[in-house]
A protein has these predicted regions:
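Hydrophobic faces of well-ordered beta-strands that scaffold small-molecule active sites
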Residues: 45-47, 86-90, 116-118, 146-148, ...
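H/E-rich (His + Asp/Glu) clusters that bind or coordinate divalent metals
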Residues: 157-177, 189, 194-303
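Mid-to-C-terminal alpha-helical segments outside catalytic/metal-binding sites
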Residues: 1-44, 72-79, 102-106, 114, ...
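Active-site gating loops and adjacent loop-to-helix segments of metal-dependent hydrolytic enzymes
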Residues: 1-27, 57-58, 64, 153-169, ...
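Histidine-centered divalent metal-coordination motifs
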Residues: 1-2, 149, 194
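Active-site gating/metal-coordination segments in enzymes
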Residues: 49-175, 179
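Acidic-and-aromatic substrate-binding clefts and catalytic sites of carbohydrate-active enzymes
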Residues: 23-28, 55, 93-100, 123-130, ...
Length: 303
């Protein structure tokens, strides 16, 4: 959370402190974060605003103001620390879709950010509602990704996200596939966390349900293949067998190096995640794609 963004957010919604108190200090302390990053000089980060969706706490007017502040600060950090931060995903005021489209244009076209971030539900509403389609059309036009972060589900979060977040991610992926959005916008790209959540593990189950039931509304017996449009990260706390499962499903070309830093144990398990990729039974060229090549191509960046 950037400095001015958090300061303004706190004034508008004092309860925000209850949400961020479980986070580690590097989420809000830039100098501590930079110091920790010095331990991994070969690792660059893509910045996103920490998980407190604007639409969850503030109305549309305040959400627009806060999103603009956050994105301005993200862009400033990219300029100030080019050897630390590789890019950033824009924060959006999703409770005002017209303002969301304007801010996406400003963040990408003017500020030079590399995509946008949304959540698995928008103020409790699913992502396949028609009112969100203009954002998907816009991002497909930019050929830049949408980061999809799981939202908190009060009915499931007694585990503080251990299993509820992968479920939230998977449910959102399913609704997007069922909606046929990837048929409509073939260039649309989503990045989901935790190696694709439940999808790789249940790949054959998905295939069976798609062919044998009416779960999928699109008239395509191979609609399950649309799950392969997602990109996934490696944030599994160093679990090589799970990464291998994701690789067997997605292939190396849709896996991006990612951790929970600056959250999680040992500062996001950066070292453990690196080791887990190095232990995978894949070629060195494929490992290089996961570590950096896919990101460079997807975000249209150069090191």
């Amino acid at each position: 959370m950037t400095e001015k963004y958090l300061s303004v957010y706190r004034k508008k919604v004092p309860a925000i402190d209850n949400e961020i108190e479980v986070y580690t200090r590097p989420v809000v302390d830039l100098q501590m974060r930079l110091g920790l990053m010095d331990r991994f000089p070969d690792v660059l980060q893509i910045l996103t605003v920490a998980k407190v969706p604007l639409e969850k706490f503030v109305g549309p007017k305040d959400a627009v103001e806060l999103a603009r502040i956050a994105n301005d600060e993200l862009a400033e950090l990219l300029v100030k620390y080019p050897n630390k931060f590789f890019g950033a995903a824009a924060c959006l005021p999703m409770n005002d879709i017209d303002a969301t489209l304007e801010e996406a244009d400003r963040a990408i076209g003017k500020l030079g950010l590399q995509g946008v971030q949304i959540y698995s539900r928008i103020a409790g509403e699913p992502l396949d509602l028609p009112k969100f389609k203009p954002l998907y059309e816009k991002m497909a036009g930019y050929n830049l990704p949408i980061w999809l972060h799981p939202e908190t589900n009060p009915a499931l979060d007694m585990d503080r996200g251990i299993f509820s977040w992968p479920y939230e991610t998977t449910a959102a992926m399913l609704r997007l596939v069922q909606s046929g959005i990837f048929y409509e916008y073939p260039a649309l790209k989503f990045i989901v966390h935790h190696a694709g959540a439940m999808v790789p593990f249940f790949a054959d189950r998905l295939k069976w349900f798609a062919s044998a039931t009416k779960l999928f509304t699109q008239n395509d017996p191979k609609i399950y293949e649309q799950f392969l449009n997602f990109y996934v990260d490696t944030a599994l706390y160093g679990n090589t067998p799970a990464l291998q499962c994701a690789y067997e499903y997605y292939g190396a070309g849709h896996i991006l190096f990612g951790t929970d830093a600056p959250l999680g144990p040992r500062w996001g398990m950066i070292e453990g995640t690196i080791r887990s990729i190095e232990r995978m039974a894949i070629t060195e060229a494929e490992k290089e794609k996961i570590f950096s090549g896919n990101a460079i191509e997807l975000f249209k960046m150069a090191l």
